[in-house]
Amino acid sequence: MKYLRYLLTTLIVLSVFIISGAIFLTFLGFGLYGLSRILIYFHLAYFGYNKSFYDNLIYYGSYIVLGYFNLFIVENLMDYFRKKLPENLYFQGLTFQLITFSVTTLLFYFIVHIHYTYIDIDFWVIVLIIGVLFICKEIFYPDSKNLNQKNK
């Protein structure tokens, strides 16, 4: 009976994670679909890859996932440098944010975007999109150095 209770609790927690993850991915998909429609409407982008549903999912999904990993790696690397060099003026304040934004944008463009031949988005549009994401990050997470209250 004890194991049945643990199994039931595990299934409930797992179902909550699966349902919330599915809702998040659905909203992310609708948001990216809306963004792509806006970019196409204003002739700022062209998405020429149009195969089957799963092929499109893998092609465009890998573009998004690689972009996210690029952002994640640069953010963590810059935070690591900030912790190792706390007195350096380049790793403080607005200069730090501008360096992080510039490195992220350039690496995304030259490592990820340039290899996807069916996605045609101008560099300045990518700069604008990533810039809006960084501004939202600073608005909603203004002091990102200690979000989890960890004292190290």
UniProtKB/Swiss-Prot annotation:
Gene: sepA
Physiological role: Involved in multidrug efflux.
Family under the similarity heading: Belongs to the multidrug resistance efflux pump SepA family.
InterPro entries named among the record's database cross-references: SepA
Phylogenetic placement of the source organism: Bacteria, Bacillati, Bacillota, Bacilli, Bacillales
Transferase found in the keyword field: no
A Pfam family matched in the record: SepA
First-listed, main subcellular location of the protein, grouped into a coarse class: membrane
Entry protein name: Multidrug resistance efflux pump SepA
Keyword Transmembrane carried by entry: yes
GO cellular component, one term: plasma membrane
Keywords per UniProt: Cell membrane, Membrane, Transmembrane, Transmembrane helix, Transport
